[in-house]
């Protein structure tokens, strides 16, 4: 009597197993929405270091579309590597990145140190391939001129490698007879330009150094409520789209590590130069695309005259 019962049990187990194995592939092949599909390129990952002037998350949100476009065009995986002011040098030295995209001052400092090749220059809506720096104070601070900055508390992004977040303004003020390093009561570093603006607004700092377009972007994002809370010192009288204090300088360069494969370098250069002006990834960074490299000799002059990082590089 036990044998027939065992036979029946085994029979049903075999049927259940067969049904289960037949149903499994159907689960794996369930449809995926078209919007989430993405081609998977082959080959080693290409690493693009992007200077994160706000945060790593913001860098990924802003420039992720550019990276995805490069990946699509060259047929290889491309990884965005957010860079601090410090590791844009250390990762270049270690070979941890194949390309860099950073501010022009740091870009030229990296070039002087590691012999990178500048491929293109970023161009932005309304301003093209140039930008500038602002010297901002709280409108209610009582500060109305550069001379009033003596004895005050100032801040900038980085005193060695930040372009429109520091060095453009330092040079401008020194040319006007005010040295932030000796004439300010304090001159500190604040890595985030958002925090510089907010610090000036709430009185933590008397004066802050930021790039053109920073105030307008924060206004669009409702991080600040009005531009009327700020005064721009020594505002230039020209037809540049944004108000600014300093001279105009070339925008961010996109450069290649000297050991990056030449064929890949040419592919990336061509990809960026031919990127459609209306591509959503460019809209995300307020850009119209990339142009042939501008003349960065002004960066060399700043580096050497102020003896900044790489000033003595051979």
At which residue positions do the language-model features occur?
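An extracytoplasmic/periplasmic, membrane-proximal ligand-sensing/linker region
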Residues: 29, 33, 40-49, 54-65, ...
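Acidic, polar ligand-binding/catalytic clefts
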Residues: 90-148
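Short beta-strand->loop
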Residues: 117-127, 183-186, 220-247
């Amino acid at each position: 009597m036990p044998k027939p019962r065992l036979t029946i049990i085994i029979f049903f187990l075999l049927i259940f197993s067969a049904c289960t194995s037949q149903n499994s592939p159907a689960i794996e092949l369930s449809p995926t929405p078209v919007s989430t599909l993405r081609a998977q390129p082959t080959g080693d990952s290409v690493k693009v270091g992007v200077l994160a002037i706000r945060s790593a998350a913001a860098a990924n949100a802003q420039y992720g579309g550019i990276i995805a476009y490069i990946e699509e065009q060259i047929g290889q995986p491309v990884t965005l590597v957010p860079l601090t002011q410090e590791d844009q040098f250390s990762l270049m030295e270690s070979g941890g990145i194949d390309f860099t995209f950073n501010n022009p001052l740091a870009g030229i400092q990296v070039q002087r140190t590691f012999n990178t090749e500048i491929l293109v220059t970023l161009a932005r809506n309304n301003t093209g391939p140039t930008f500038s720096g602002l010297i901002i104070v709280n409108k209610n601070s009582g500060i109305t001129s550069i001379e009033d900055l003596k004895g005050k508390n100032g801040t900038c992004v980085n005193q060695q490698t930040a372009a429109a977040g520091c060095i453009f303004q330092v040079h401008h003020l020194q040319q006007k007879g005010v040295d932030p390093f000796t004439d300010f009561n304090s001159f500190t570093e604040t890595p985030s330009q958002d925090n510089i603006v907010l610090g000036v607004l709430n009185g933590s700092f008397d004066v802050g150094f930021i790039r053109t377009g920073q105030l307008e972007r924060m206004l669009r994002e409702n991080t600040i409520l009005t531009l009327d809370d700020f005064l721009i010192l020594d505002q230039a009288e020209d037809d540049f789209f944004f108000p600014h204090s300093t001279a105009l300088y070339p925008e961010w360069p996109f450069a290649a590590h000297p050991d990056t494969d030449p064929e890949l370098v040419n592919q990336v250069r061509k990809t960026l130069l031919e990127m459609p002006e209306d591509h959503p990834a460019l809209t995300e960074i307020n850009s119209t695309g990339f142009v042939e490299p501008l003349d960065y000799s002004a960066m060399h002059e700043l580096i050497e005259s102020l003896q900044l990082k790489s000033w003595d590089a051979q």
